[in-house]
């Protein structure tokens, strides 16, 4: 009975919010604490990389302008007119028994058919390259999904596109590891850890081989024009090899588009990553003082080829990078330097013998 009475609560009125101070309380540090104080390092690289990726997507997104629609409509109308006129000429030649004109119409029909077939084939290959980006987005969604039923069919489709046989040991291990109680995220994750590294290892070997050839060619060759032509040819072959490994058949326009994608990715995100991964280690080892100018140029060309191959891998892979499995330039740099030093030592020792 000695407890004080509680104040009345009127439920008809809105609840009163407790006033909150707009200012934080002052914090004071002693002199000893100020000596050991270390500011928190804020990593702004993910935000910068996100801005770069958004810029790449904006640059690569096709722009449907009115002029393009008018040109496409005009070409379609012209093609229909050519086909109609060809049919009319064929009918007239058949009725008048003009066999020479009829043979010309048949030859023209064969040429037009071959051209249409080439256009359809190029469009199909270009569509397949664009579809790989959609598959990568789908894989990213499955890796963050808890649904069931889509992961296995998706991974089997990827294995079929890459040309992996059903009896392959990696694919057999994946089949043995999955079961019905697993969701899509776990199934796709197992595929990324058991099957996808087989293709990635082959792509890494191709990148290492092409980068080493570029490094040695630049370091040995005295002709700059030959170097430029050789590097351009080898880089195009590297892109073709990586695309073939990941099950993408390139045509003329799809090859140009993939090369454009790679160059744009390097332009937006390559410089900062190159400096971050190579610059400090390069200066610490003082390689510029140890190697000649041509050797340094060869290492630079090899690193550029490796960078090109890494970006081609990223654009041709059906799965996004997970668990830091993306290859780094440092992985290829040590190999390039070792091969170049070995070659230079052999070239110096051979005249002495």
Swiss-Prot record:
Residue spans of biased composition, Basic and acidic residues class: 1-19
Transmembrane annotation, as ranges: 70-90, 100-120, 213-233
Primary subcellular site in the record, as a coarse category: membrane
GO annotation, cellular component aspect: plasma membrane
Location relative to the cell: Cell inner membrane
Membrane topology label: Multi-pass membrane protein
This protein's record includes keyword Disulfide bond: no
Superkingdom in the source lineage: Bacteria
Residue segments, region Disordered: 1-35
Keyword check for Cell membrane: yes
Keywords recorded for this protein, A-Z: Cell inner membrane, Cell membrane, Membrane, Transmembrane, Transmembrane helix
Similarity remark: Belongs to the UPF0283 family.
Name of the featured protein: UPF0283 membrane protein YcjF
Organism name: Salmonella paratyphi C (strain RKS4594)
Lineage start: Bacteria, Pseudomonadati, Pseudomonadota, Gammaproteobacteria, Enterobacterales
């Amino acid at each position: 009975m000695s407890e004080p009475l509680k104040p009345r609560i009127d439920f008809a009125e809105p609840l009163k919010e407790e006033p909150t101070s707009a200012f934080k309380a002052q914090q004071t540090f002693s002199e000893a604490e100020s000596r050991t104080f270390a500011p928190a390092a804020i990593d702004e690289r993910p935000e910068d990389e996100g801005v770069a990726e958004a810029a790449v997507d904006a640059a690569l997104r096709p722009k449907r302008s009115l002029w393009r629609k008018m040109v496409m409509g005009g070409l379609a109308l012209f093609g229909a007119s050519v086909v109609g006129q060809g049919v009319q000429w064929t009918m007239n030649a058949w009725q008048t028994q003009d066999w020479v004109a009829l043979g010309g119409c048949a030859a023209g029909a064969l040429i037009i058919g071959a051209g249409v077939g080439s256009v359809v084939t190029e469009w199909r290959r270009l569509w397949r390259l664009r579809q790989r980006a959609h598959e990568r987005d789908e894989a990213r969604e499955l890796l963050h999904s808890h649904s069931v039923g889509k992961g296995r069919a998706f991974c089997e489709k990827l294995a079929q596109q890459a040309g992996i046989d059903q009896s392959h040991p990696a694919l057999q291990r994946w089949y043995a590891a999955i079961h019905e109680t697993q969701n899509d995220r776990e199934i796709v994750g197992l595929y990324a850890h058991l099957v996808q590294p087989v293709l990635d290892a082959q792509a890494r070997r191709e990148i290492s081989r092409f980068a080493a050839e570029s490094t040695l060619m630049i370091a040995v060759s005295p002709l700059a024009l030959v170097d430029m032509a050789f590097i351009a040819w080898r880089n195009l072959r590297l892109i073709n090899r990586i695309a073939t490994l990941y099950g993408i058949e390139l045509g003329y326009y799809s090859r140009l588009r993939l090369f454009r994608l790679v160059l744009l990715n390097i332009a937006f995100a390559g410089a900062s990553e190159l400096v971050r991964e190579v610059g400090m280690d390069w200066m610490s080892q003082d390689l510029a003082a140890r190697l000649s100018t041509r050797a340094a140029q060869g290492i630079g060309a090899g690193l550029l080829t490796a960078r090109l191959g890494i970006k081609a891998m990223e654009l041709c892979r059906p799965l996004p990078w997970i668990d830091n499995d993306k290859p780094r330039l440092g992985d290829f740099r040590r190999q390039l330097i070792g091969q170049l030093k070995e070659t230079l030592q052999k070239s110096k020792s051979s005249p002495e013998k």
